[in-house]
């Protein structure tokens, strides 16, 4: 489905597999994506289908059900249900479980290369372990941060009291996927100007006039901005490199 899971599938399959991503344009809003007839047809020839699950548009579920493809649903590998936070690739547990599920699916579909898939799985987990070690070294209380959209899990932490007191309206509107009121926006801008927020995390795929106001206020207040996305940006070739780069960006933002 989305390209970050396609990159994991490629890493785990090596030269033995051919991976086709359904969503290839990184500027497309994944929540609103509607599959074309060509997209559905691709599932008909697949032996393994990897989809995100949770609230992210269930394109893969709909298209893969009539086929014989083994379906790997990333969210479900960690017990995340439909309606939960869909940005599951930020979770180490989901990444690890999904990788193992993909490997098992490959070994079932192509048993003659079972050992190859086991070796690639081991190599992938070694890289994932390096990423988790990097995150562990960074994960500590770095001060208040407010997110523009609910993308969590990479560097989790509590939301400090100053954040709740000064920007609760905006944060609540974002959590409910509704638009903040003018008063909420002003409160947030004032919070940024007052120096209560040390870092602003922004979903670049949901940019609009409201976020422009907030990011503008953050820049004016010299608050570091870290951009996240719901699909892996073009400059990265695999999910783990993208996650590692984000950790570097967070580290630079809080120096």
Please name every model-derived segment.
Residues 1-255:
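Extracytoplasmic metal-acquisition and chelation regions
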